[in-house]
């Protein structure tokens, strides 16, 4: 699945995926056990793990809320200097807590759908693409590693901000619970991220096989092309799997995007208040741009993974057009290629959330621009206090 174990990137990706799996089991956000009795390993939904995950994560959230109210008496100097910053920080905190409550409820409510998706991925991996697992997909490994690094970077950035902010008297339990909640939410998003990347990897493998088939037909027109029917069937299943994945995670991903973009606003506003209003010049200010860059990197990885899958589907249509340039074409080959091309033109890999917007690079860029426009509006609104 990950290529040669001697290569560092496939090895790192494999270890990071294992860590994600064990961490998800530990926090109860992947409530499935492995049923190894069947020829192809399948996942079985565990009621105990489902209940354990719901109770554990809700307990952590409500404990975090209680501790936050207990230790809210001490106010940061930045909040005294700028009440708008305090208001924004409270609103972002409420958004994050509500997002956590909804995400964990959706994880519980939609666990059956997620189980079906995972079992379909296992069938594709160990049955349909079994002979192609030796082919290394560089983008898959790269994106998995980067996503895990951003999760680690966010946790380190959160710790840095809590230690670096002047006048902040933090409670270690509050910080640890906040990190645990953030880690749990990131693992939920990681499941979607890996699902998208696996679909991309399978489309990429189909494209590579189609390219090989084109090369063989150019050299030998009598080459067996019956595999096109198999690729067409797999492509249909991947399109359906993509649709199910988007439906299962559309609310979680929408909340994730809202939380990420709104978090970027408050980080920049903190930097403006400390740097311009309070004229506090110290090394700790580096923590704010560092946190901002990690958040944008994490946000863009999710956008780029979806965009990569869309482009892989578009590339399939381009490869199929090459078949029309072949000489000595067979009628059956032409019929198979036309059917495949029709499917590619009428059904595409799209990641539209809640029917509102698509996740691709163009829309991701618009979201980032919109975030900074909101920031400009806040600066204009609160200009006299800055």
Curated annotation (Swiss-Prot):
Q: Where in the cell is it found?
A: Cell membrane
Q: Which residues lie on this side of the membrane: Extracellular?
A: 70-89, 177-178, 276-282, 385-386
Expression tissues: Expressed in taste bristles in the foreleg and labial palps. In larvae, is expressed in neurons of the dorsal and posterior pharyngeal sense organs. Expressed in taste neurons that mediate sensitivity to bitter compounds.
UniProt keyword terms in alphabetical order: Cell membrane, Membrane, Receptor, Transducer, Transmembrane, Transmembrane helix
Q: What InterPro entries is this protein classified in? A: 7TM_chemorcpt
Principal place where this protein is found?
A: membrane
GO molecular function terms attached to this record: ligand-gated monoatomic ion channel activity; taste receptor activity
Set out the biological process GO terms recorded for this chain's protein: detection of chemical stimulus involved in sensory perception of taste; monoatomic ion transmembrane transport; signal transduction
What GO CC annotations are associated with the protein? Answer: axon; dendrite; membrane; neuronal cell body; plasma membrane
The keyword Cell membrane is annotated on this UniProt entry:
yes
Q: Which ranges does the record mark as transmembrane?
A: 49-69, 90-110, 156-176, 179-199, 255-275, 283-303, 364-384
Q: How does it sit in the membrane?
A: Multi-pass membrane protein
Q: Which residues lie on this side of the membrane: Cytoplasmic?
A: 1-48, 111-155, 200-254, 304-363
Q: Specify the superkingdom.
A: Eukaryota
Q: What does this protein do?
A: Probable gustatory receptor which mediates acceptance or avoidance behavior, depending on its substrates. Seems to be involved in the sensing of bitter taste since it is expressed in neurons that mediate sensitivity to bitter compounds.
Which family does the UniProt entry place this protein in?
Belongs to the insect chemoreceptor superfamily. Gustatory receptor (GR) family. Gr22e subfamily.
Know the name of this protein? Putative gustatory receptor 22b
